């Protein structure tokens, strides 16, 4: 059994060993898996960022960021403008015509984050989103992403097996 509440704008980590159900919990929260009992209350649109960046190698940074909007059929001029603003605001605009294989691991994760933010989620689920990065890059990227989420006013729930990573960013851990 698990019970917790996350207030708007908070960054919360669920920390535990591999196989304990952290990713399953995120899948239940996202509505991708059914729960066996209990209740889940979500107030807002959810974005989901996985361990692997899942950037499409044949698409430019800009076209990768537009992907979620295309899938949701919301690739409007207003949303395209918002994406361009995000890319500029977070230092990725100059790389908009590059392909994923031309980016560092940290930059790829930032592109994946901007792609997730493009759909304007109120809640972001991070499933071991930085574990594929080396320690130094992970520290830098998690700090960058934490600042971006705070700046955008997004509530985040991160799962990790790394205690130091979870405690570094979060005010609350489960």
What do the PLM-derived regions correspond to, one by one?
Residues 62-70, 80:
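Short helical segment in ABC ATPase nucleotide-binding domains corresponding to the A-loop/adjacent helical element
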């Amino acid at each position: 059994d698990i019970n917790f509440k996350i207030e708007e704008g908070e960054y919360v980590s669920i920390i535990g060993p591999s196989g304990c159900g952290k990713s399953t919990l995120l899948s239940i929260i996202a509505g991708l898996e059914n729960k066996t009992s209990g209740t889940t209350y979500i107030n807002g649109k959810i974005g989901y960022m996985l361990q692997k960046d899942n950037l499409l190698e044949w698409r430019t940074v800009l076209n990768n960021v537009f992907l979620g909007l295309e899938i949701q059929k919301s690739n409007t001029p207003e949303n395209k403008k918002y994406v361009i603003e995000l890319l500029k605001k977070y230092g990725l605009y100059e790389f908009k015509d590059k392909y994923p294989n031309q980016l560092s691991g940290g930059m790829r994760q930032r592109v994946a984050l901007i792609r997730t933010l493009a759909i304007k989620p109120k809640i972001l689920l991070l499933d071991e989103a930085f574990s594929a990065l080396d320690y130094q890059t992970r520290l830098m990227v998690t700090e960058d992403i934490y600042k971006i989420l705070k700046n955008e006013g997004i509530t985040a729930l991160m799962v990790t097996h790394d205690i130091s990573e979870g405690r570094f960013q979060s005010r609350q851990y489960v």
